[in-house]
């Protein structure tokens, strides 16, 4: 009951915040339209309680740490049974809190054990006009028609070893017509782009560092990519265990990478790199790990990576 109360309180808060945001913009991915948690909206509530600044509250069954995403009047999120055997998509009406869809998407025969710090529904969905893509890590990815809830396509082959006790957390993102997903497990590490209409693979690029030389718990990561400028175009800056990469978002070709000593990079507070002009700031993981900063190289791979290790203290 305590965990359900926390889930409800969090959901009510996010609804109230995004209710104002959505008047001028769609909150279509993890941490909003720009991926950095910022909004141009004003007049957002600064405090709330059970009786203050709450328009509605809707119970969400089971457990899930995914953030809601909003398009129009729809709010989508995911949830899963505590042991991960059943995975669900939830949609509610933004204005009333009324349940629109409660869809059982996947059954999982043998989910890996996780701790209470994670759930089997932690990755945040991504949404655009008419489609929502919901990702559960190795356990499945689905694209739904937002009006009917009909399943348009699924993928259950993006498999990796999420590590016993850890579980999935990397959220998908949309880059033009592709859904980009990180698959960074203990056994395999790659980034993949799927056609958002068909779900077919557009490109798939293995991580180029030699992960077999790293301790096994340094290979896992929980991140998502961000777009950064590169000349007149863009590059996809992609954090992983022990490294930070950049790829051509159209072809998946690796443009550059830098190696660092951070590991277990996680979306707390930022599951994607923070891009500031030509500079990238990336959290290197939990405990006393290094937090690399570097240049988001505009002209391709540099002769010498311009990296600055900014700190070694544990950060939230």
PLM features per residue range, with description:
Residues 22-316:
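Noncatalytic, solvent-exposed loop/strand surfaces
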């Amino acid at each position: 009951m305590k965990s359900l109360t926390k889930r409800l309180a969090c959901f009510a808060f996010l609804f109230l915040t995004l209710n104002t945001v959505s008047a001028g913009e769609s909150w279509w991915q993890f941490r909003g339209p720009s991926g950095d948690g910022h909004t141009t909206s004003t007049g957002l509530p600064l405090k709330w309680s059970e009786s203050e600044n709450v328009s509605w509250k809707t119970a969400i069954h089971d457990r899930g740490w995914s953030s809601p995403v909003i398009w129009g009047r729809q709010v989508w999120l995911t949830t899963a049974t505590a042991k991960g055997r059943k995975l669900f998509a939830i949609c509610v009406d933004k204005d009333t809190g009324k349940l629109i869809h409660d869809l059982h998407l996947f059954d999982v025969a043998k989910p890996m054990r996780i701790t209470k710090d994670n759930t089997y529904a932690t990755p945040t969905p991504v949404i655009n006009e008419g489609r929502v893509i919901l990702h559960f890590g190795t356990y499945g990815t689905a694209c739904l028609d937002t009006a009917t809830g009909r399943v348009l396509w699924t993928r259950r082959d993006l498999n990796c070893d999420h590590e016993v006790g850890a579980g999935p957390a990397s959220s998908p993102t949309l880059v033009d017509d592709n859904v980009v997903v990180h698959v960074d497990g203990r056994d395999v590490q790659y980034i993949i782009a799927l056609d958002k209409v068909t779900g077919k693979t557009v490109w798939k690029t293995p991580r180029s560092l030699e992960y077999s030389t790293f301790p096994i718990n340094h290979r896992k990561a929980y991140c998502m990519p961000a777009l950064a400028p590169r000349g007149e175009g863009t590059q996809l800056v992609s954090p992983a265990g022990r490294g930070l990469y950049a790829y051509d978002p159209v072809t998946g070709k690796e443009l550059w990478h830098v190696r660092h000593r951070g590991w277990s990079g996680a979306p707390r507070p930022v599951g994607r790199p923070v891009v500031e002009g030509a500079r990238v700031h990336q959290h290197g993981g939990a405990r006393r790990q290094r937090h690399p900063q570097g240049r988001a190289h505009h002209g391709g791979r540099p002769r010498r990576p311009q990296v600055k290790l900014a700190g070694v203290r544990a950060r939230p």
